[in-house]
UniProtKB/Swiss-Prot annotation:
InterPro entries: Cyt_P450, Cyt_P450_E_grp-IV, Cyt_P450_sf, Cytochrome_P450_monoxygenase. Its cofactor is heme. PANTHER family: CYTOCHROME P450, CYTOCHROME P450 12A4, MITOCHONDRIAL-RELATED. It comes from Penicillium crustosum (Blue mold fungus). The keyword Kinase does not apply. The gene is xilC. The keyword Heme applies. Pathway: Secondary metabolite biosynthesis. This is Cytochrome P450 monooxygenase xilC.
Amino acid sequence: MSRLEIALSSTLDHLLKHIFLGTVFLTSLYALYRWLLPKPLPGIPFNQKSAQSIWGDVVELRDDPSGLAKWCSKQLENHGSPICQALMGPLSKPVVLVADVGNAREMLMGRSDFDRSAYIIDRFPLFGEFHLNMKTGDNWRQSRNWLKDLLAPQYLHNVAGPAIHSSVLKLIKLWEHKSCVGDSRAFNMVSDLKTLALDVIVAFHFGSDFQDSALDRQVDHVGKLDGSKLPCGEHNEVEFSKAPLHEFQQALTDVGDKMAAIYTTKWPPLIVAWWVRYVSPYYRPFFQAKDRFIRKHINLAVRRYRNDEEPSTGIDYMVYREEKAARKAYRQPMFDKQIMIDEAYGNLIAGQHTTSAALVWILKLLADYPSVQEKLREELQGIFVGAMQENRLPTAAEIITSKLPYLDAVLEETLRLRAAMLVPRDATKDTELLGRRIPKGTVVLLVCQGPDYKPSPPSKYWSDVKASRVYPGKGNPDLEVFDPERWLVRNEKGDLEFDGSSYPQLAFGLGIRSCWGRRLAMVEMRIMTTLMTLKFELKDVPEGLRGHEASYDISYRAKKGFLRLKSLGEVP
């Protein structure tokens, strides 16, 4: 063989080798691409275009300015189906979206094949061993058992009710000061309602053991302000400075805000939470101090129990419950365990944020719908005629025990429109939902305001769902409109009654994993709405301060929470 032939043969060998290696590389790259592509669940609609991208629906979701809840509703609308799936990128399982809440709720109630979702648990690592962050099991049942007495009518009526009433009266005083100092101009109510919820939840747990009222501090602070020197915003709203809080209350507020930020962060929540808890020079000291603070109050409760004193605080009832459970199980009480500290701490955080968000929506909607506000005021004046004649506001007991159908309808309608937008659940085993197979470990998101909320549903399926959605009252057929009448009926005697049982309400979740604090929240909303409606006329605010844009984290929170008040005196 000549040198030329040898050279050509060698070159050809090298070329074939490179072609082979290139083919292997490209084939491997393609195989990797195929392996990274989302794996849709069979039989459930999905976006075909997203299935050809390793990022699935993530890019579209990230770039959608309307947020997760609205994006989920749009997917269901586009597919014309009660169920579809979102493809969440490489190595992630699809998330199943369900919007026919009427049917899905009945399927999920009482079923053991759906549980608290890791989707939520993974986003709230700062809660620690709080029951909200647990799968259903022995630890969860133990933690929930500690709270049973706090939901009893005796505690809600005799302890929580008066504490809420007292705090709302302080808020009324604060807002009277703000309205006077600010010359009846609009101001932001969000911080004040968070302060109200903070005072209530702290009083609920610690009672007279903690005397420092955040609202008292704000009242004293605003009372010293000079209205002529207050800054104004773009729409002539008054901007009030805030008084410093007790360090424990300030930390509760700040940590709650940080949890909300972690919920929506693009960074891994566990990494952010680790930095906050163990590295941050601002937050790290609080996590050390809050354990000592709560443990001190647990020890006070233990001392009262061993002195045979009657329980008077939320912590007392938790301690007494644990003592009884320990005796029954022949074990030592868990007073010094982290799980008990985290249970108290978690309730303080969650109770403050979720309730305050709902209170903002109630007042915004009443201001936006003056006819509803006036009708509510007429009901309250008629029911509390004795208080009106005595030139006073009704007591907590009067508000809690009175039959107030229109007030109940206002609260129910607010929760229908402006509470939970998404309810996540995890499939604990292979199961079915709406006739589709759901594998174990799949995240299911119940979309509370689906395409059937639109005035003109986008498909026959959603038209049929809308037609089957029966409310007790006649109400506005447009489900995006605030109309309490949809919850009201006439009984056999012709009297107006509230009926909240005819259609599912997911504001507080569902099943055994529903929100334990629902009764407390409803008492707080009832008292606050009653007193504010009797004390103030809620006026409209400038156009630039209106709007119902919201963010979704621990709760569904209004981005604009402005209020303009006209005092009605001691009584209207």
